[in-house]
Amino acid sequence: MVLNEVFREYLEEAIGKDNSLVAFSAFERPASSSVRINPFKSGPVPEGREVLWNRHGRILAQRPVFTLDPSFHGGAYYVQDSSSMFVGHVFRQLVKPVIADSGNAGPVRVLDLCAAPGGKTTDLAVSLREMLGYRFVLVSNEVMKQRA
């Protein structure tokens, strides 16, 4: 892969020569495929190794043809890059102490203003339901019409 020289120099300066070489070599490898399993649906899901920061995430050994899989269309899993699943991990770590302190103060309210296409929103919904049952309100909105 041919990378822009300005980008190469910037990355070397930002993270150091050794780390930038690791990043540049990653650009040469095929992209990984990962899915997030919907724990509230049933059906066969692709097997893979667990994403460290999301117990419902799986990194696949190879990319299947998702559009031919009825479980995909039935919502048993969502195709999502493992790096996007990290947002849910951060959310869970930040919200746990808030929930512990709130007791029965009423439903937890969450507003997602960058909601399209919906992968991170559904990850938040699963996390909230696992932590709170149905004691939450999640409002998702996408302000950019072309993304919605």
List PLM regions with ranges:
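S-adenosylmethionine
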Residues: 1-148
